[in-house]
């Protein structure tokens, strides 16, 4: 992993003991950016993060001043999750995580909730293009999803 951006360190997740901190980051980020998410879906997803979602991906953690502040989860060529604590949003942490997983894990795909305009713009500005749309998300919930791939013309 790499160090850069001052005191930002990108590293592999240290295992299950770190999951509670990652759930806190997820909660902060989702509350700030996913106002379209139904409360019961929020609770259900949150309850499955440590048991189902985190173990299914390779997690990269962004740490600032010794504290986790963001993370990315990758499966194959797909970025399955990227969340940054709302307290440090806009400081380049998401960009650093995305650059790391593209360069070192071969990420070339991401799915984005259609209602999450900020995330869509983030990925477009970093070279991703929309290649498809699904009416339901991966868990068959009524959250339309945009399928994006890294453009070869970056």
Across the structure, where does each feature detected by a protein language model lie?
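Conserved acetyl-CoA-binding loop of GNAT-fold acetyltransferases
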Residues: 124-133
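A short helix-loop-beta-strand connector motif used in the catalytic cores of GNAT acetyltransferases and
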Residues: 50-61, 78
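Conserved acetyl-CoA-binding loop-helix of GNAT-fold acetyltransferases
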Residues: 90-103, 120-121, 125
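Conserved GNAT-fold acetyl-CoA-binding loop/helix
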Residues: 24-50
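A short, internal acetyl-CoA/4′-phosphopantetheine-binding micro-motif in the GNAT/acyltransferase core
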Residues: 78-89, 112-113
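Conserved beta-hairpin
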Residues: 58-70
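A short beta-loop-alpha structural element at the N-terminal edge
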Residues: 8-24
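Conserved GNAT acetyl-CoA-binding A-motif
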Residues: 103-115
């Amino acid at each position: 992993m790499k160090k850069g951006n001052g005191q930002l360190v990108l590293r592999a997740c240290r295992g299950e003991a770190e999951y509670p901190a990652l759930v806190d980051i997820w909660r902060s980020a989702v509350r700030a950016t996913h106002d379209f998410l139904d409360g019961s879906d929020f609770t259900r997803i949150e309850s499955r993060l440590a048991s189902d979602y985190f173990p299914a991906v390779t997690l990269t953690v962004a740490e600032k001043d010794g504290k986790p502040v963001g993370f990315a989860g990758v499966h194959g060529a797909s970025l399955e999750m990227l969340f940054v604590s709302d307290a440090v949003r806009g400081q380049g942490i998401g960009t650093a995580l995305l650059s790391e997983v593209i360069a070192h894990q071969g990420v070339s795909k991401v799915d984005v909730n259609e209602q999450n305009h900020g995330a869509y713009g983030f990925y477009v500005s970093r070279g991703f293009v929309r290649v498809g749309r699904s009416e339901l998300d991966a868990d068959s919930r009524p959250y339309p999803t945009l399928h994006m791939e890294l453009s070869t013309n970056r």
